[in-house]
Structures are given as C-alpha cells and as structure tokens.
Amino acid sequence: MSGMHGASREALAAARERLDALTDSTSVDAGSLADELAAVTALLHREVSLRRVLTDPAQSGEAKAELAQRLLGTQVSGTAVDLVAGTVRSRWSQSRDLVDALEQLANIADLTAAQKRGRLDNVEDELFRFGRIISSNTELRAALTSRSATTAAKSELLAGLLGSRAERTTERLVTRLVTAPRGRSLESGLESLSKLAADRRDRMVAVVTSAVPLSDTQKQRLGAALAKVYGRPMHLNLDVDPEVLGGIRVQVGDEVINGSIADRLEDAGRRLAS
C-alpha cells in the first residue's frame, strides 16, 4: 500500500479524509464500519472482473459510484456504501490499489474505534509485541502462515493466543491479516498495521533496543528528545536485547541512531583497520 503512486496516492488520501470526517461523528460505529469495509475488501479481492470495472478509467466516476451503490446497497450500511461509492469515483492507477485502499480504511476504522475508547496505545504496543513473538517463534509463524490450515483453525489459534490477553482491536486486526494476507508476509503486514496505529496520533515510531529495560524516566526523556529532533510526537516500541552491550540503539523508519557500546566498538575497529 505504501507503494501507491500518482492517482492512487491522491485517491487514498481523499478516502482517508472522508473516513476521518465520518468517524468524527459520535453516531458512527467505527468498529462496525471496519467490518463492512473488510467485507467489501474481500469481495473485490475475489471478484477481479468487478474490481476492474470499478477502476476502469473509461467509465465516469459517477457511473462507477452508482454501480457500487446498486451492488452494496442491501449488503452494508448507508455509511459504508457512501464511503465506497466516493472511493470508486476517484481515479486509481491499478485495480489492486482500490482493494488495498479499502483494506487500509477498514484497519483505520478499527484503530479509530480503539482510539475513541482510549485504548490505542495498548493496541500499538500489542501489535509490536506480537511481531516480536512471531519473529522468535518459528512454529507459531508456520502455523499462522500455513496454506493447508483453514481460516477457522487460524482464527481459533489467534483467539486462544490473544482473546483474553489483548485488546479486541488487536485481535481483529491480526486475525484479518492472518486469514486474508493477500500476498503479504506476516511481518510486513504487522509493520504496516503498526505504522497505521502511529499515524492515528500523527506520531512517528521509534524502535528502541537496549541491553536492559528502560525506566519510566528514561523512556520519557528519550521520547521527548526524539520528538525534539524529528519535530513530531514519538511513540516508542521497546525491545530488550542482551547482546547490545550498553547504551541504546534507536531506529526511526530507515534511520538508525547508533549509541550502543557494540556500535562504538565496531566503529573503532573499522577506523583501526582503515
């Protein structure tokens, strides 16, 4: 989804603005809207010919919107129909981009529901921790990505793992990702969800790795320092790695701030060798 260009990028931005306007209303159930958008995503993923018709540049935006309204009018709420109709009115560079966009809107709606309940921070942290669990547990990853396992079996496994321990939003997001990966790896999907969660508060995400857990004071100071450097609020995803001999390693996007003893030793070794 981050790979959208040109018309699709503009269309996605417009769709996100429409979604934000809708979910700002207290009368809109963001969680239910997420379910409906996810159902439309699944439909268009399956029905390639329909997807192509709804993104055909030779058809007027109004004609495509009317088609979406006829097809979905009795299947989902009026709010969901209006949002999808507005989305297909836009021009899309590729038909797949429309499906990616609707999936992203579903995820944002779920995150908005969590934000309204004051639980967004919990969801962000749980997504990060689940990603770490997946990266260190090859058996669990294999079970969740197995092509031979049924959707029901994967959902049941996730319910057992997350149901009583995690936020409902976290379970919903991860279950959708696992049961409908649409060609993505589990890791990249979780990373995308984490970025969306951070975007809900217009924050950047810093992955902080330290040899020992940071104190609350250290976390607050680091967050404030990074916010000052980057000019935006910063959410810290914390990880402990005993192999980091001391100090802290911080990664923000593709940028790595090397402040650990291990890095300083490696830099010193390179200087001696040169």
From Swiss-Prot:
Q: Does the keyword Ion transport apply?
A: yes
Which GO terms of the molecular function aspect are on file? Answer: proton-transporting ATP synthase activity, rotational mechanism
Residues that span the membrane, as ranges: none
- Tell me where it resides: Cell membrane
Record's bilayer topology term:
Peripheral membrane protein
Quaternary data: F-type ATPases have 2 components, F(1) - the catalytic core - and F(0) - the membrane proton channel. F(1) has five subunits: alpha(3), beta(3), gamma(1), delta(1), epsilon(1). F(0) has three main subunits: a(1), b(2) and c(10-14). The alpha and beta chains form an alternating ring which encloses part of the gamma chain. F(1) is attached to F(0) by a central stalk formed by the gamma and epsilon chains, while a peripheral stalk is formed by the delta and b chains.
Function (record text) = F(1)F(0) ATP synthase produces ATP from ADP in the presence of a proton or sodium gradient. F-type ATPases consist of two structural domains, F(1) containing the extramembraneous catalytic core and F(0) containing the membrane proton channel, linked together by a central stalk and a peripheral stalk. During catalysis, ATP synthesis in the catalytic domain of F(1) is coupled via a rotary mechanism of the central stalk subunits to proton translocation. This protein is part of the stalk that links CF(0) to CF(1). It either transmits conformational changes from CF(0) to CF(1) or is implicated in proton conduction.
Please give the name of this protein: ATP synthase subunit delta
